[in-house]
Each structure stands twice: as C-alpha cells, then as structure tokens.
C-alpha cells in the first residue's frame, strides 16, 4: 500500500525532477505551488510505478493529483496503486485538477465517473512571445503602460536574481510593505509566502528576476520551469511606479 509523507522544503530536491519534466501545463503540477500553499492543500506524497503521487486535502476531503511520471513512469500502474489505497482506507477516489488530455483516459478507465469543470480555477496560458513582445491591438494597454514606465525611468533594467540574501531584495520587500495597504489575513499571508519562496533562490528550483530603476528594485518575479511551461508563481511591483507590473512581465518572458 502507498505510504505517504508530508511534502516539505526538505523533500524539494527529491521531488523537483518530477516537476521539471512535467508538461501538464497546470500550475498545481509544480513544486512551487505545493510549497507555497502547503498550509491550504496540504500535500503529502508517495512514489510508485516510477511516478510521483500527490495526496492533497481540500475542505476535509482527500483528493489526488494525476500521477506525475518519472523517466520510467507507468501512469496506469500508479492509478492502480491509488485505487488500492482508497479501497484499503475506504475513501472515495477523487482525482483533482486533471490535465485535459488525461480526462478522456480516465472516463474510459472508470465506467461510472463524474467530471466537474471548475471554470473560475482555470489557469491563464500565454505564448512566451506574446508576453515578451506585447504586439498587436490586444496588448495595446500593456504597451502604453510600459512606454510610460520607460519614459519615467529611462535607466530601468531587468536583472536576474539568484541570491536569496541579495540586499536589493531585502530593500524591495521593505519598500513594498510600506506601500502595501491590504489588511486581510489572506493577503498578508500571501505576501509572507512570497518572501519565503524568494528565500529558496539558492536551491536552483526557480528562476527569478527584478526590474531596477534609479538604483533599486521596483518589481520582482519568480517562476518555475515545468516541461515546456514557465509557471509564474509571484509578481510584485511597487504601486508608486506606474507600469512596473507589465514591464517586469515583458522582461521576464524575454529573459526566461
């Protein structure tokens, strides 16, 4: 039977290779989401049939990610292991956030199954070149904001961030918190989690960068490469610097 253990930062190096090659194009299939939101999921993991199996707990119910294949992974055998686990524990079998191309396979595997599409929770997917160029009428608003930002801060430049102890990052969080006026507990916790993620820069699991203007960081971003998709976990910019948000989006896409 599957033996699950809690997914923590300590297990990151062990699990990151699964996510590094995972091409499901869903943010839930990333190490960053599992770490950043571990208090809400919370994720536990097991390995079977060459696959990573994640068990989350959503609103008190155990739900499973679709198996993430390793080099010799067998998704069918991993699903069988999940089925046996649920049978032994007398749990309903619930697969959550299933990749679209896997859903039809599951319908064939399970004759009596309910499929639910949660539209509000769907991810936004962009072509890299669209964000790197912001070309065409669709992105005219973003271009206008970036042009204003460039006029206001002609010295602005994108820099890669790799050191969690970079003093420029420390200064950015101080500046950001000074402009941060959200009082809700979730907003405050999200900010704390974002800072925690940047503390993991030296692990090599994530890529990060920032926009420098007038000698200081005015925007930062952190993402994770999962297969052919760059999963953007964090974007923060100083509200006082209009256009910094689309500027960091464009520069980040062009760099990574």
What is each residue range found by the language model?
Residues 1-20:
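Short, extreme N-terminal leader segments that mark the start of a protein/domain
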Residues 24-29, 181-195:
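Conserved GNAT-fold acetyl-CoA-binding loop/helix
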Residues 186, 191-256:
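Accessory, usually C-terminal, subdomains that scaffold auxiliary metal cofactors
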Residues 81-85, 148, 175, 197-199, ...:
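A generic secondary-structure signal
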Residues 111-183:
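Acyltransferase donor/substrate-recognition loop-hinge adjacent to the catalytic core
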Residues 17, 28-101, 212-239:
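Conserved donor-binding loop and adjoining core beta-sheet/short helix segment
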Residues 91-109, 120-123:
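Short, glycine/charge-rich beta-strand/loop segments that flank catalytic centers
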């Amino acid at each position: 039977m599957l033996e699950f253990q809690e997914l923590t930062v300590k297990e990151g190096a062990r699990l990151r290779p699964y996510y590094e090659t995972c091409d499901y194009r869903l943010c839930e299939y990333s190490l960053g989401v599992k770490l950043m939101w571990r208090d809400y999921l919370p994720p536990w993991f097991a390995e079977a049939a060459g696959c990573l199996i994640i068990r989350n707990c959503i609103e008190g119910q155990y739900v499973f990610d679709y198996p993430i294949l390793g080099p010799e992974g067998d998704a069918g055998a991993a699903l069988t292991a999940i089925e046996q686990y649920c049978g032994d524990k007398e749990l309903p079998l619930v697969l959550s956030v299933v990749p679209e191309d896997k859903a039809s396979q599951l319908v064939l595997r399970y004759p009596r199954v309910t499929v639910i599409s949660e539209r509000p929770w769907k991810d936004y997917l962009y072509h890299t070149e669209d964000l790197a160029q912001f070309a065409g009428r669709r992105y005219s608003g973003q271009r206008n904001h970036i042009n204003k930002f460039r006029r206001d801060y002609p010295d602005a430049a994108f820099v890669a961030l790799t050191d969690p102890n970079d003093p420029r990052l420390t200064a950015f969080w101080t500046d950001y918190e000074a402009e941060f006026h959200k009082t809700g507990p979730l907003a405050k916790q999200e900010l704390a989690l974002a800072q925690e993620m940047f503390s993991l820069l030296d692990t090599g699991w994530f890529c990060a960068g920032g926009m420098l203007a007038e000698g200081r960081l005015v925007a930062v971003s952190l993402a994770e490469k999962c297969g052919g998709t760059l999963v953007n976990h964090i974007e923060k910019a100083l509200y006082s610097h209009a256009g910094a948000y689309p500027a960091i989006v464009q520069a980040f896409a062009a760099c990574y």
